[in-house]
Design a protein with these regions (language model features):
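PLD/PLD-like phosphodiesterase catalytic module centered on the HKD motif
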Residues: 1-50, 77-224
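Secondary-structure "cap/kink" motif recognition
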Residues: 57-62
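Short catalytic-loop micro-motif centered on adjacent basic/acidic residues
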Residues: 65-69, 131-134
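Short, solvent-exposed loop/turn at the beta-strand->alpha-helix junction
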Residues: 72-75
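Short hydrophobic beta-strand segments
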Residues: 38-41, 63-68
Length: 224
């Protein structure tokens, strides 16, 4: 009896399996082209591909662009902050006090907030319009990462700094109204989400308070 490897067995005896795999790949490709769902395998080249897709999404913004990432860093600002193409848009970033208080590995005397503030100040001198907001709290009240582009919201499987370096996904939220409203609510409430420059002045004060009011607790169906 001839010996067949598992791969050869499926090719010879289960041709329908190959057809299914081909159809599955076509379907995933169509989702990727429409920016509905994209899977990144974590291979070495995937990180640069993931970064390029995020930059493309940011560049497509015509009305608003908000990046929500509790670990948003100086590196992310320099990589993504310059990719808004519309002069009418202020790129808004929401990050967390918990991360900004942490030390920088390569610069142990500096905090993440210090170097992010310096980079933001430098970009502002080149007329790049970016505002950064800081969610207060000893622990970040924000866990997931998402990007608002006009009336769309895209969920990221990891923070921008590592996006694509391991297996992860980008997913367009079917009904984004709640997340858009939540991001806007954070930005408007300076008591829980001040601008970075304001937070820098008082960063050792009040950040340990609870964040009981930080989430919009209404049902999604109640939000217009």
């Amino acid at each position: 009896m001839p010996f067949f490897s598992p791969e050869a067995y499926f090719i010879i005896f289960c041709p329908h399996t190959l057809a299914f795999q081909a159809e599955q790949q076509r379907y995933l490709k169509s989702l990727e082209e429409k920016r509905i769902f994209i899977y990144f395998s974590g291979k070495e080249e995937e990180k640069s591909r993931a970064a390029e897709i995020v930059k493309e999404l940011i560049a497509e913004a015509k009305e608003r662009c908000v990046i929500c990432d509790p670990y948003f860093s100086r590196k992310d600002l320099l990589n993504y902050g310059i990719h808004v193409t519309s002069l009418d848009i202020v790129l808004k970033i929401i990050t967390s006090a918990a991360f900004l208080k942490s030390k920088v590995d390569s610069e142990p005397e500096s905090r993440q907030g210090d170097i992010l503030y310096e980079a933001l100040d430098s970009l502002s001198k080149h007329k790049i319009n970016i505002k950064c907001y800081v969610l207060r709290g000893k622990k970040s009240p924000l866990h997931d990462r998402f990007i608002v582009v006009d009336d769309y919201v895209y969920l990221l499987g990891s923070s921008l700094s590592e996006f694509g370096s391991r297996a992860t996904t980008l997913y367009r939220v079917p009904d984004p109204k709640f997340l858009i409203r939540q991001a806007e609510r954070w930005i408007k409430d300076k008591t829980i989400c001040p601008l970075l420059e304001e937070w820098m002045k008082n960063r050792e004060v009040q950040d340990d308070e609870s964040n009981n009011s930080i989430w919009d607790t209404r049902k999604i169906g109640d939000i217009s």
